[in-house]
């Protein structure tokens, strides 16, 4: 017999919260990196092809992080919506069951 995983609305909401928290942490790390990058790229401190390459890397990190944040936000919002739908369907099913068989059978 295969093991099953029961997914609850609370599990979906908890996962959405974890995604948001991890994205905030990633954003903090990236902002720190980019701030350091801007400090290092000061022309008085550093110049040449290394600055250009480093700037391109920082720009790419920013672009990719924005994609991750957009996707992660959509995912988290979708999980919260799915949790609400699950609860709505469960309530509708319970009401339909009780209407069909009586209130004493559903509890």
From Swiss-Prot:
Disulfide-bonded cysteines: none
Pfam families: WXG100 (PF06013)
Alphabetical list of Gene3D superfamilies matching this protein: ESAT-6-like
GO CC terms of this entry: extracellular region
InterPro entries: ESAT-6-like_sf, T7SS_ESAT-6-like
UniProt-annotated location(s): Secreted
SUPFAM superfamilies in UniProt: EsxAB dimer-like (SSF140453)
Alphabetical UniProt keywords: Secreted
Family: Belongs to the WXG100 family. CFP-10 subfamily.
Protein name as catalogued: ESAT-6-like protein EsxD
Organism: Mycobacterium tuberculosis (strain ATCC 25618 / H37Rv)
């Amino acid at each position: 017999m295969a093991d099953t995983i029961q997914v609850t609305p609370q599990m979906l909401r908890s996962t959405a919260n974890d995604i948001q928290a991890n994205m905030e942490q990633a954003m903090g790390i990236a902002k720190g990196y980019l701030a350091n990058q801007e400090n290092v790229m000061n022309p008085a401190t550093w110049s040449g092809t290394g600055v250009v390459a480093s700037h391109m890397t920082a720009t790419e990190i920013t672009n990719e992080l924005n994609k991750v944040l957009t996707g992660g936000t959509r995912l988290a919002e979708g999980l919260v919506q799915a949790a609400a739908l699950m609860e709505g369907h469960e309530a509708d099913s319970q009401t339909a069951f009780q209407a069909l068989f009586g209130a004493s059978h559903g509890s």
